[in-house]
Amino acid sequence: MNLHGLELPGRDQRLSPEVIDLTEDIEDDGADVSEVTLLDLTRIPEFQPRRRIRTSRNHLDANLSNVPTINSIPSPVTRPPVAVGGGIFYGARRTRNRSQTQRRTLLENGFRNSRKKAQDSSNSIAERVSPPPGFCYDVHPHNNIACAKCGNELVSDEKKSIFAAKCGHLFCSTCAKELRKKTVPCPVQHCRKRITKKFIFPLYL
């Protein structure tokens, strides 16, 4: 592009640009020329990476000998056992000479005592709370099962049989025969469920 004779707006004089030849070497003693360090990436570096120093076994044993052990700690102050909920528990500090067998024995005794107390309390509650008469039977080896209607002892033999209703109550063969004739309510006071011919059946003991 020829810039000679070019007139720009706002300028009275014509532009006369200065041409600089970049291919010409400039010999200037005052110019600050710094040397550039070249790094050859194709060569293997002379220095080697640092390797981890292996610690010998003797050095480790010497360091471990300085660590305090349980035997080197003086015996702490003993604390009395604390009974909580029937079990015996010891405080955070315990004597070093107490064996594990003794501690296990004390814990077993505490659990045994707590179990015995729980059984005694449950037995006393069962004795105080008894079911209403005629509602259910507390069957024990020394108790005899009786008919829910006549109260006679129920015995299963060749002459008599035991019958049961759908509600769960037991009757002798004589009372069961009367109950099977017509639909009647259960004679037990707290039951009063309807007993029909289909809802009463014999028990083979």
UniProtKB/Swiss-Prot annotation:
<keyword id="KW-0539">Nucleus</keyword>
<dbReference type="GO" id="GO:0006281">
    <property type="term" value="P:DNA repair"/>
</dbReference>
<dbReference type="InterPro" id="IPR001841">
    <property type="entry name" value="Znf_RING"/>
</dbReference>
<comment type="subunit">
    <text>Part of an E3 ubiquitin complex including rfp1, rfp2 and slx8. Interacts with slx8.</text>
</comment>
<feature type="zinc finger region" description="RING-type; degenerate">
    <location>
        <begin position="147"/>
        <end position="190"/>
    </location>
</feature>
<keyword id="KW-0863">Zinc-finger</keyword>
<dbReference type="GO" id="GO:0120290">
    <property type="term" value="P:stalled replication fork localization to nuclear periphery"/>
</dbReference>
<dbReference type="InterPro" id="IPR047134">
    <property type="entry name" value="RNF4"/>
</dbReference>
<protein>
    <recommendedName>
        <fullName>E3 ubiquitin-protein ligase complex slx8-rfp subunit rfp2</fullName>
        <ecNumber>2.3.2.27</ecNumber>
    </recommendedName>
</protein>
<dbReference type="Pfam" id="PF14634">
    <property type="entry name" value="zf-RING_5"/>
</dbReference>
<keyword id="KW-0862">Zinc</keyword>
<comment type="pathway">
    <text>Protein modification; protein ubiquitination.</text>
</comment>
<keyword id="KW-0479">Metal-binding</keyword>
<comment type="function">
    <text>Mediates ubiquitination and subsequent desumoylation/degradation of sumoylated proteins and proteins containing SUMO-like domains. Involved in maintaining genome stability where it acts in the cellular response to DNA damage.</text>
</comment>
<dbReference type="GO" id="GO:0006511">
    <property type="term" value="P:ubiquitin-dependent protein catabolic process"/>
</dbReference>
<dbReference type="GO" id="GO:0033768">
    <property type="term" value="C:SUMO-targeted ubiquitin ligase complex"/>
</dbReference>
<keyword id="KW-0833">Ubl conjugation pathway</keyword>
<dbReference type="GO" id="GO:0008270">
    <property type="term" value="F:zinc ion binding"/>
</dbReference>
<dbReference type="InterPro" id="IPR017907">
    <property type="entry name" value="Znf_RING_CS"/>
</dbReference>
<dbReference type="InterPro" id="IPR013083">
    <property type="entry name" value="Znf_RING/FYVE/PHD"/>
</dbReference>
<keyword id="KW-0808">Transferase</keyword>
<dbReference type="GO" id="GO:0016567">
    <property type="term" value="P:protein ubiquitination"/>
</dbReference>
<dbReference type="GO" id="GO:0005634">
    <property type="term" value="C:nucleus"/>
</dbReference>
<dbReference type="GO" id="GO:0016740">
    <property type="term" value="F:transferase activity"/>
</dbReference>
